[in-house]
Amino acid sequence: MRNKKDWTQLMEKLVISVGVTGSRITREQTPYIPITAAEIAQSGIEAWRAGASVLHIHVRDPKTGLGTQNYEIFKEVVDRIRGETDAILCLTTSGIPGRNLEFRERLVPLTFQPELVSFDAGSVNMRENVFLNPPEFLEL
């Protein structure tokens, strides 16, 4: 039987990516989901302190709890996380499922020059909604 020291020496490097909120889960489904910019940033910072190196970030409208691509909310989250961590940020360009936003709104996260962005390369059916990714968006 291996002792702990031997086991840790055999481990390979690992990248842990954390999706702090996603875009669909609500407080009605779980009271623990971060909604405000401060809550989302704090959850990301805590995940980084626990060992995550990549933080996949969606932001929420604090009034509705729903996903948004609002510049000011993204800015607050990004500034707070960058102020306390060296985490790799993966910001979403997917927008909000069921609300097909204008392309310029979906590209707001690029203004923060994240190390990574999520980019859905095709349209997706999500229950009663269709998440559109037409060629005009994909070719931007």
Give the location of each predicted region.
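Alpha-helix-loop-beta-strand connector modules within alpha/beta enzyme cores
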Residues: 65-91, 139-140
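Extended substrate/RNA-proximal surfaces in nucleic-acid metabolism proteins
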Residues: 99-140
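N-terminal small/glycine-rich loop or linker at the start of catalytic domains
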Residues: 6-32, 118-124
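Hydrophobic faces of well-ordered beta-strands that scaffold small-molecule active sites
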Residues: 16-20, 55-57, 87-93, 115-119
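Histidine-centered catalytic micro-motifs
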Residues: 18, 37, 54-64
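Glycine-rich anion/phosphate-binding loops
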Residues: 32-42, 72-73, 99-103
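Conserved, mostly hydrophobic/aromatic
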Residues: 40, 47, 58, 117
